[in-house]
A protein has these predicted regions:
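Helix-to-loop junction immediately C-terminal to a conserved catalytic motif
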Residues: 110, 390
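ABC ATPase nucleotide-binding domains
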Residues: 29-59, 287, 291-342, 562-591
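H-loop/switch region of ABC-family ATPase nucleotide-binding domains
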Residues: 259-260, 525-526
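Catalytic Walker B motif of ABC-type/P-loop ATPase nucleotide-binding domains
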Residues: 223-226, 490-493
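Conserved ABC ATPase "signature" region
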Residues: 177-194, 447-461
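Conserved ABC transporter NBD signature motif
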Residues: 118-130, 398-406, 415
């Protein structure tokens, strides 16, 4: 058993270069100066770690968890009696409700828990047969690669190319090896055009790919990823998952990945770890566990409703099973809704960052009483547009009017009351010591914020420090804080990151309720399943311009990339499983 003290507030571990987050151990100049020179200047090679990623003498099992238990302080067990073996060349998916302990399980595997989190750990973790519980992190830094939920927190250099090379320099690899691996990784992840970009100018999805790439360059034996596709558009997510699959199948790298968007990862997984509460972990093949799992992708829920066996895990299998179902369901009646009065009017809005045009002469109107989804590839300008609408972000031209008022002309407090904004990095809005204090500051002690938080993610202790919450729990807290002010217009940037399916259904209901009160809601998201649940209208951005707009059923049906799973299986106008269930029930009662 190992007991570690918790880290000092504000000194969180940096996820990005191996289990310890210890990336500044090399002697000499600082990381930025070294990073700029390392690809152009020969230097002593130092210790070398040769060979392809994933390959080790003997192969076989890579990581083994034996009777693992973990708890924070005197709290209930987060993990209990966990046994898990990951073999070479295996992709294992970790799933479960928000706050069930997925990130903690990954932290135990990498050694971050309890070394950097505090808490009590029992049991043992073996890497290639050797215990890592009591060994220093530096001894496994090149063998376990880790990318956390906030990839930007691990960046220590200025540019993409420098960041990809930094970890290799700490391992003492020769410059020619570093150059080759950087080029291979840039091509592998499709980010060659970003090589010279400042990391601070990248979109969230671009940062995610750079963080993954910076780990891949070190050729780890085990790759541990916490929500790796949460900030990626559907196409980019497929590319990253295809890359991971190639590493698994061709190079024998083992991958352990925690993900809420099961529809993306389940088809690639060899096995699945399902955290079901009380610290218990169930391990098995995805098809077996998803039969009764409380968290399941839409395609599995559709299979349950239709009585298909075995349950489909991908769209191709579901389409084969669904032959005839679409005809039996018939069509949905088209409902003509009157155009609402615009709550937000935007004319020729432009945003420029340096030499990059992020938003290009955009015209749009957001109607009161409507939920509009803002979609597009990573880097298409969604976040820049949202910040410009709120009034805090820069504008290079154009006008924004919210009920006749330009938010940019208001004080910060005035803007927050008129236009609520949940940013992509929601934790930036948290600054107090406990969840209770954050809620009281948001609603003046009325209890409205806490009540909303309980609806989104039940059971978060009032005395918990916000920085100790999981990513999904922190997001839910920020959502409750912003929504408790009930602003006239609500803007949300990737609000479903870290949320399970149940929490997303609750969030969709909250947003629909706000829209029913006459508020305008704009949600920037890559989560096509959430769009199918909540949106009335969709705007699609490409290179800063609106390239498609209209009702959700028409826009998503036009785009294979943004279509939800039910639409891919049954075709338009079907978007959601609950629509299919309702129609089947109607037909059953009529027969």
């Amino acid at each position: 058993m190992v007991v570690r003290p918790p880290p000092a507030r504000g000194r969180l571990p940096r996820p990005g270069r191996g289990p310890a987050g210890e990336r500044d151990g090399a002697a000499g100049c600082g990381p930025r100066a070294r990073g700029r020179a390392l690809l152009a200047t020969a230097r002593p090679a130092g210790r070398r770690h040769a060979g392809a990623p994933g390959r080790a003498a003997g192969g076989g099992r890579v990581i083994e968890l034996r009777d693992i238990g973990f708890a924070y302080g005197d709290g209930p067990p987060v993990l209990a009696d966990v046994d898990l073996v990951i073999d070479e060349g295996e992709l294992v998916l970790v799933s479960g409700p928000t706050g069930a302990g997925k990130s903690t399980l990954l932290g135990v595997v990498t050694g971050l828990v309890p070394r950097f989190t505090g808490g009590t750990l029992s049991g043992d973790v073996l890497l290639d047969g050797v215990s890592i519980v009591r060994t220093p992190p530096r001894e496994r830094a090149h063998r376990i690669g880790y990318v956390g939920q906030n990839p930007a927190a691990g960046f220590v250099t200025d540019t993409v190319e420098e960041e990809l090379a930094y970890g290799m320099e700490q391992l003492g690899l020769p410059p020619d090896t570093m150059r080759r691996r950087v080029e291979e990784t840039l091509d592998l992840l499709g980010i060659a055009d970003l090589r010279g970009r400042d990391l601070r100018t990248l979109s969230g999805g671009q940062q995610q790919r750079v963080a993954i790439g910076s780990v891949l360059t070190m050729h780890p034996r085990l790759l541990v990823l916490d929500e790796p596709t949460s900030a990626l558009d559907p196409t980019a997510a497929e590319e990253v998952l295809a890359t991971l699959t190639r590493l698994v199948h061709d190079l024998g790298v083992s991958v352990l990945v925690a993900e809420h968007r099961l529809e993306r990862v389940v088809p690639f997984a060899d096995r699945m770890c399902l955290l079901g509460g009380a610290g218990r972990v169930h391990v098995g093949e995805p098809g077996e566990l998803l039969v009764t799992s409380p968290v399941a992708p839409p395609i599995v829920e559709l299979g349950r409703a239709a009585g298909w066996r075995p349950l489909p895990l991908n769209v191709r299998d579901a389409r084969r099973l669904a032959r005839g179902l679409a005809q039996r369901l018939g069509s949905l009646p088209e409902v003509e809704e009157p155009a609402p009065e615009p709550a937000v009017a935007v004319r020729r809005l432009a945003v420029v960052h340096g030499e990059t045009v992020a938003v290009r002469d955009v015209d749009l109107a957001l109607g009161g009483g409507r939920v509009t989804a803002l979609m597009g590839r990573n880097g298409s300008g969604k976040s820049s547009l949202i910040w410009a609408l709120q009034g805090s972000g820069p504008r290079s031209g154009g006008r924004v009017s919210v009920d006749g008022t330009d938010p940019a002309q208001l004080t910060a407090a005035g803007r927050r009351a008129l236009v609520g904004l949940v940013p992509q990095n929601a934790a930036d809005l948290l600054y107090l010591e406990t969840v209770a204090e954050e809620c009281a500051a948001a609603d003046g002690g009325t209890g409205a914020c806490r009540q909303l938080l309980e609806q989104l993610v039940p059971g978060i202790p009032a005395t918990q420090h916000p920085r100790d919450l999981s990513e999904g729990q922190r997001l839910a807290l920020v959502l409750a804080i912003v929504l408790s002010a009930r602003p006239r217009v609500l803007l949300l940037d990737e609000p479903t990151r870290g949320l399970d399916y149940a929490a997303k259904r609750v969030l969709a209901g909250v947003l629909r309720g706000l829209a029913a009160e006459g508020r305008a809601v704009l949600v920037a998201t890559h989560d096509v399943e959430f769009v199918a649940q909540v949106a009335d209208d969709v705007l699609v951005l490409a290179e800063g311009e609106v390239v498609s707009s209209g009702p959700v059923r028409r826009v998503v049906a036009e785009s294979p990339s943004f279509a939800p799973q039910v639409t891919k299986v049954l075709g338009p106008p079907w978007l959601r499983v609950d629509e299919v269930v309702r129609r089947l029930a109607e037909q059953a009662s009529a027969s």
